[in-house]
Each structure stands twice: as C-alpha cells, then as structure tokens.
C-alpha cells in the first residue's frame, strides 16, 4: 500500500501510526540495527527523476573551488620540457671556481673525499689517491697518504703527466720555469741561430767555366761566371796567382 498522495503537483506522505513504530523497532532488532544509529531522511522525488547524487547532502561547500589554470599550464609544460628546464634545479651548485689559497673550489665534494678530486678516505683514517685513465679505461692507484692534501697533490702530478697542461687539478700548479727565465732562454736561442747564419760562407770553386767572350771582357777587373751553386765573382789576379792563363778559345791552360 502506498503511503503518499499528491496535492497541487507536490507529493506528500501519510502519517505513520504508532502501531507501525512497534513493527519498525522489531524489524530493526531482527536485522541487527541499533536503535541509537542515526537515521538519514531521504526526500521524495518525482517519478521522472532518474538519479540523485548523495554526496551533495554531506558536502559543506557545494561550490567547487576553481583550479589554478596557471599552475596546470606550468605542469603541462614541465611534463614536456622537464621540471629542471622550466623551474630550474634548486639543488644545483654553481660550477664557477673560486681560488682560495691556491686551491680550486668547484662543486661540493662529499666529506669522504676531503673536498679534492681523486681522493678518498679509508675506513682506518688514511687518505688514498687514484686517477682514471680515459684512454686505457682503467684506474691507476697512487697510494695512501696521511693527509688529504698530500693525496690531492699526488693526483695533480699524475693528472699533469697523463693529460698535460689542460688537466684539471686540485691546486694551481705554476709552470716549470718562471716567465722571465723562459723568455731569457728563448732570446738566447734566437741569438745563437743568428750567429750560425753569419758564420756560413759561400764556398768558391777554383775552377771557373767561361761560356762567352763578353763574359771575359765585360769588366776589366772581374769575371762574372755562373756555377751550379750560384753566382761567383773571381778576379783575374787570382787566376795568375794559381798559375793559369786565358786562351781565346775560352779554355784554361796551365803554364809549363
């Protein structure tokens, strides 16, 4: 039997008699329901109503909060390019080196390395040094030392030997010779080279080949001749001293 009726389009419910309350209490005890359990009053709906959201009854703020559109946009961009690129890496340490007392300070090193490259602290308190060879793909053991600074200097020496002047070192290593001494040595080398050039003399051949009469009488005092090594100037007096005579047939005859 239906306990409701309609008035002016509104659906109303009949009052429940006291006898029915007794039956309701018995039914609640039968199904194990507590009398002190709270009751939820459900409203009546029209027949054309298909669904009802029960969460709206318990929501304290029925109006949903508007989302931050800027944050959603930033998150979507960060998913594509990466958070480190968009927001920056907060834990990143600047790679700029600051020199303090001749020591290069770069990125933060853990305490077990003593703040130096290629240095590690052993469990018994000493410091070990080793360097990686990129060409051979191996590690070179440099030994153990009493202090971290000694181990770091051993690493620097090995790095300079393996990688030359472009090696990254813990300490600022000066050149082998000061600039003044190196410049003086370079000047001495240049002077020695110039002296050697001055000492070089052109070797003159004693035998001269004459090819024409004009070559003989072009100059009264000198004979211009051409040799394999270059132009050679010879004097007529030198020919007389050597005991040679000139012949019109352009040959050289020795005196008898």
From Swiss-Prot:
SUPFAM superfamilies assigned: DNA-binding domain
Segments of the chain annotated as binding DNA: 115-172
Keyword terms: Activator, DNA-binding, Ethylene signaling pathway, Nucleus, Transcription, Transcription regulation
Record keyword Nucleus present: yes
SMART domains per record: AP2
GO molecular function terms listed in the Swiss-Prot or TrEMBL record: DNA binding; DNA-binding transcription factor activity
One Gene Ontology cellular component: nucleus
Entry-linked InterPro entries: AP2/ERF_dom, AP2/ERF_dom_sf, DNA-bd_dom_sf
Keyword Disulfide bond: no
Chief location: nucleus
Family that this chain belongs to: Belongs to the AP2/ERF transcription factor family. ERF subfamily.
Role, per record: Probably acts as a transcriptional activator. Binds to the GCC-box pathogenesis-related promoter element. May be involved in the regulation of gene expression by stress factors and by components of stress signal transduction pathways.
Protein name: Ethylene-responsive transcription factor ERF084
Phylogenetic placement of the source organism: Eukaryota, Viridiplantae, Streptophyta, Embryophyta, Tracheophyta
Gene of this entry: ERF084
